[in-house]
Swiss-Prot record:
NCBIfam families: PRK05309.1, uS11_bact. SUPFAM superfamilies: Translational machinery components. It comes from Listeria welshimeri serovar 6b (strain ATCC 35897 / DSM 20650 / CCUG 15529 / CIP 8149 / NCTC 11857 / SLCC 5334 / V8). PROSITE patterns: RIBOSOMAL_S11. InterPro entries: Ribosomal_uS11 (IPR001971), Ribosomal_uS11_bac-type (IPR019981), Ribosomal_uS11_CS (IPR018102), Ribosomal_uS11_sf (IPR036967). GO terms for molecular function: rRNA binding; structural constituent of ribosome. Keywords: Ribonucleoprotein, Ribosomal protein, RNA-binding, rRNA-binding. It holds the Pfam family Ribosomal_S11. The gene is rpsK. Coiled coil: none annotated. Located on the platform of the 30S subunit, it bridges several disparate RNA helices of the 16S rRNA. Forms part of the Shine-Dalgarno cleft in the 70S ribosome. This is Small ribosomal subunit protein uS11. One of its GO terms (biological process) is translation. GO terms for cellular component: ribonucleoprotein complex; ribosome.
């Protein structure tokens, strides 16, 4: 029986002009995912995946680095224009949007899609530090 050779599939370079950047900014981390207009992922990055650990993940600088990293790999697919959707209350929201613009991508629209409960679940108790 012939041995199966280990061949990895190469990433196909797609020619996509416009896409959507989904920025999820929590109190602990910032995740930036860039998709095409149908929602298929092109690139993603997060503060934790770039090596930031602990409380450094939640900083605006970490969010900026995550957005730059995702933008760089999305530009390899030919991406030029972006719509941005921002979700969550974290500190890296504005920094990530600015980093996408600084990376050379044209931001056409910014939407805030943070889920707001209509008095659903009881929130966690307040921290006393």
């Amino acid at each position: 029986m012939a041995r199966k050779t280990n061949t990895r599939k190469r990433r196909v370079k797609k020619n996509i002009e416009s896409g959507i950047a989904h920025i999820r900014s929590t109190f602990n981390n910032t995740i930036v995912m860039i998709t095409d207009t149908h929602g298929n992922a092109l690139a993603w990055s997060s503060a934790g995946s770039l090596g930031f650990k602990g409380s450094r993940k939640s900083t605006p600088f970490a969010a900026q680095m995550a957005a730059e990293s995702a933008a760089k790999s999305a530009q390899e697919h030919g991406l030029k224009t972006l719509e941005v959707t921002v979700k969550g209350p974290g500190s890296g929201r504005e920094a990530a949007i600015r980093a996408l613009q600084a990376a050379g991508l044209e931001v056409t629209a910014i939407k805030d899609v943070t889920p707001v409960p209509h008095n659903g679940c009881r929130p966690p108790k307040r921290r006393r530090v």
